[in-house]
Amino acid sequence: ERLTDVRKEDKMTEKEKMISGKIYDPSDKELTQLRQNAHRLCTEYNVLPETDEKRGEVLKSLGINGSAFYLQGPVQFDYGCFTTIGVNSYANFNFTCVDCCPVTIGDNVFMGPNVSLLTPMHPLRWQDRNQYAKPDGTMTDKEYAKPITIGNNCWIAGNVTVCGGVTIGDGCVIGAGSVVTRDIPPNSLAVGVPCRVIRGITEADSLENHPELF
């Protein structure tokens, strides 16, 4: 079976390897063109006034899967087409999504300023990580990526970084400045570096129980 798997991987394109979490060549022509196009479109989006209807056209060209979401901008996607954003979800200023593997954001997700979703992974040993020249002289390196999933009805506060391979369950609140390196179960309040669950979110947190806020 292992030999069969190796043969399958050999027949995969570099894009297929990348979104499957396999080691891939980031200097691949198709991937380079996709990134350059996404970066160009992000630059276009970021200079448009937030009232300009052209922003919607730019996001459509970027290939983000989903509708009825709002990105305040500036934004930066590595590809865009490997990201799915649910209904009524929102990202505040300076949203970064390095979507080398699929990024899935659920419905009604609030993301504060400077949120970063980072799927790329690099080898730990520098001997495996450093750049090298291919036979044609092009510089490349060995990279892989892990997907990120954020469930429905989450609040990801400002300056949060979510690392590759993480799933955040429905109804979670991730405190400001957290670095999320492991899965967070549904309906959790989690915070810290690395991010840890502080407690569950319960009916006691209902605004009805906090009249002092009104």
PLM region descriptions:
Residues 59, 71-77:
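Arg/Lys-rich RNA-binding interfaces used to dock onto structured RNA substrates
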Residues 61, 83-85, 184:
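Short, T/G/N/S-enriched strand-turn elements that build extracellular solenoid repeat scaffolds
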Residues 162-191, 195:
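C-terminal/domain-terminus segments
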Residues 1-67, 124-127, 195-214:
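Terminal amphipathic alpha-helical/low-complexity segments used for targeting or macromolecular assembly
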Residues 67, 107, 152, 170-171, ...:
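Short acidic capping loops at alpha-helix termini that bridge into adjacent secondary structure
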Residues 15-16, 61, 140, 146-147, ...:
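Short secondary-structure boundary/capping segments
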